[in-house]
Each structure stands twice: as C-alpha cells, then as structure tokens.
Amino acid sequence: MSIETLVEEIGKLTLTEASELVKALEEKFGVSAAPAMMAGVMAAAPAGDAPAQEEKTEFDVVLTAAGESKINVIKVVRALTGLGLKEAKDLVDGAPKTVKEGISKDEAEKVAKELKDVGASVELK
C-alpha cells in the first residue's frame, strides 16, 4: 500500500474513527500526538489569518525580566553580546530591552534558551 493510498483512506475516516486510530497508534508506538498537534495548530493559525504574509526570517530577542538570578543573567548577556559589565548590567536593569536583533530563528531560540536557563523572562519578536 502506498503512502498516498493510506492518506486517502485515512481521509475517509469519521472524526471518531480518526480519534480511535490516533489512540491505537499512540499505544502501539508509545508516543503522544498532543504536542505535535498543538504545534501544528499554532503554526497553521497565522497562515489562515494572513495567507499573503511571508514567514519571518529575522528575530529580536527581548529580555523582559531578569528574574531571581540577576547576576547569572548579566553573565549570560555579557557572553552573548560582548558588552562590558556595566553595559550588560544596565541592559538587564532596564528590562524590557533587546539583547540581540536581526538574527535567525535558530539563533534567537538558542539565545532565548540560554537566558531562560538562568531564570530570565524572554520574548522573541
């Protein structure tokens, strides 16, 4: 059976049957479809609202709050930006501030993860 045939057959299922199929696949392979489905829904929503809009390629990482471990956040900001101690401290104290701008999505997510790992609140724009 080809993948195309399988997809067509699955497309003929009722919602109840499709739900049962998902449950059976989850049990058989020991996985959960919930996170993947949520990501798909979230990714599909903007496309439905503005189909002509292109996917964003440049992102800004904005520090919204330093959290409990301000010293560690300052250290990470210094490492990421190359700023001096005073400049990094001023940036963290003045939150919300942009830490990095015009960077790729992968790099922005990496920067955001590093900041979140030390307790900072971060936003990608």
UniProtKB/Swiss-Prot annotation:
Disulfide linkages recorded for this protein, renumbered to the chain, are: none
Instruction: List, in alphabetical order, the Gene Ontology terms for molecular function in this entry.
Output: mRNA binding; structural constituent of ribosome
One Gene Ontology cellular component term attached to this UniProt record is: cytosolic large ribosomal subunit
List UniProt keywords, sorted A-Z.
Ribonucleoprotein, Ribosomal protein
Q: Which domain of life is it from?
A: Bacteria
- Tell me yes or no: is Ribosomal protein among this UniProt entry's keywords: yes
GO terms, biological process: translation
InterPro entries the record matches: Ribosomal_bL12, Ribosomal_bL12_C, Ribosomal_bL12_C/ClpS-like, Ribosomal_bL12_oligo, Ribosomal_bL12_oligo_N_sf
Please give one Pfam family short name.
Ribosomal_L12_N
Q: Which family does it belong to?
A: Belongs to the bacterial ribosomal protein bL12 family.
Q: How does it assemble?
A: Homodimer. Part of the ribosomal stalk of the 50S ribosomal subunit. Forms a multimeric L10(L12)X complex, where L10 forms an elongated spine to which 2 to 4 L12 dimers bind in a sequential fashion. Binds GTP-bound translation factors.
Q: What is this protein's function per UniProt?
A: Forms part of the ribosomal stalk which helps the ribosome interact with GTP-bound translation factors. Is thus essential for accurate translation.
The UniProt entry, under NCBIfam families, shows: L12
Q: What is this protein called?
A: Large ribosomal subunit protein bL12
Report the source organism: Chlorobium phaeobacteroides (strain DSM 266 / SMG 266 / 2430)
The taxonomic lineage of its organism, from the top, reads: Bacteria, Pseudomonadati, Chlorobiota, Chlorobiia, Chlorobiales
